[in-house]
């Protein structure tokens, strides 16, 4: 009986990974080949060289997009979202988030909370700050919308 259950569980996980959907467990580091959803806990979700769509959901998540065009959602909780290289879309969500678009022309939206945005990469980024007191570290070419504090020195994550 145990072997049958283990076989079924292994096959189910393999099918989910082949379909490009990976499930993260609380406190577990998870590599997401294409699309990935976190849990209600604190997740560490990592993209690959493929374009990724990663959703942290609840919890204080660490999300890394890596290469190419990634779409990253922090969700509820104080998240750290890193776009990596490529033209990324990064969304902080609710909570006090740290959002770094990475290298490339990025779209960054913080959501509610007192957020910190890092966009000093030499590319023109579009940055939309939400409710709360947001600090953004930018280049002169970045375009800001509703951001409370603009800084040009390097942020400390």
Q: What are the residue ranges of the model-derived segments?
A:
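Leucine-rich solenoid repeat scaffolds
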Residues: 118-157
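Bacterial N-terminal signal peptides
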Residues: 9-17
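Alpha-helical transmembrane bundles and membrane-interface segments of multipass inner-membrane proteins
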Residues: 25-26, 40-41, 98, 107, ...
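Positively charged n-region of N-terminal signal peptides that target proteins for export
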Residues: 1-4
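Glycine-centered beta-turn/loop sites at beta-strand termini
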Residues: 37-38, 47, 56, 64-65, ...
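N-terminal segments that cap or nucleate solenoid repeat domains
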Residues: 24-69
């Amino acid at each position: 009986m145990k072997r049958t259950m283990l076989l079924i569980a292994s096959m189910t996980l393999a099918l989910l990974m082949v379909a490009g959907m990976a499930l993260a467990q609380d406190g577990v580091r998870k590599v997401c080949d294409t699309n990935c959803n976190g849990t209600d806990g604190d997740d560490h979700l990592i993209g690959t060289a493929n374009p990724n769509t990663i959703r942290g959901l609840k919890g204080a998540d660490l999300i890394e997009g890596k290469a190419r065009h990634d779409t990253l959602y922090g969700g509820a909780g104080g998240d750290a979202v890193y776009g990596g290289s490529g033209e990324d879309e990064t969304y902080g969500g609710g909570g006090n988030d740290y959002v770094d678009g990475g290298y490339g022309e990025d779209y960054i939206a913080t959501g509610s909370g007192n957020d910190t945005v890092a966009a000093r990469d030499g590319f023109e980024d579009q940055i939309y700050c939400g409710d709360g007191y947001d600090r953004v570290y930018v280049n002169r070419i970045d375009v800001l919308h509703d951001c409370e504090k603009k800084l040009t020195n390097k942020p400390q994550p």
